[in-house]
Amino acid sequence: MLATGIKNKIELNVTDKNTAKAVGSGTLEVYATPQMVNLMETCACFSVEPYMEPGKTTVGISLNISHVSATPAGLKVWCESELTAIDGRKLTFNVSAYDEHGLIGEGTHERFIVDIQKFMAKTQGTVSYTHLRAHETLSDLV
């Protein structure tokens, strides 16, 4: 059952392919912020996926994170997530990323539970984000 307190941890090794220089988010050969964000989203997403009803999944809707320490290629990094709030279909997670020396990033991430078929039908042309009327919200799309 989906409930607050669900935790997850995933890890990876920093390689030349996920540095700021390689992904274009900077010029240095250190773990890229966009890659850390991806790790955080993936960690949160897969923590709750086993609890989704058939035909449902989650989509990311917000991130508020800080990247507080650089990590060179060759080190292991990992993310830990915890589901801290459930508000209808909106899920809020605390996310933290670490390397072998300590904390490298932290913050909050929100995801929204959606019906897969409905969501994909709407994103494939029946509703475009660029054509949203002022009164429409993400909830209207799912």
Where are these regions (language model features)?
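Short beta-strand edge segments in extracellular beta-sheet folds
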Residues: 110-114
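A short, polar/charged loop-to-alpha-helix boundary motif
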Residues: 115-122
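Conserved small/polar residues in nucleotide/adenosyl-binding loops
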Residues: 130-137
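Catalytic strand-loop segment that frames the active site of acyl-thioester-processing enzymes
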Residues: 1-31
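C-terminal structural segments of small proteins and small subunits
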Residues: 102-106
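Short, residue-level hotspots on alpha-helical faces of the histone-fold
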Residues: 38-42, 46
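Hydrophobic beta-strand-centered segment that forms part of the acyl-chain substrate-binding groove
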Residues: 45-78
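Hydrophobic beta-sheet segments that form the core/acyl-binding groove
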Residues: 65-100
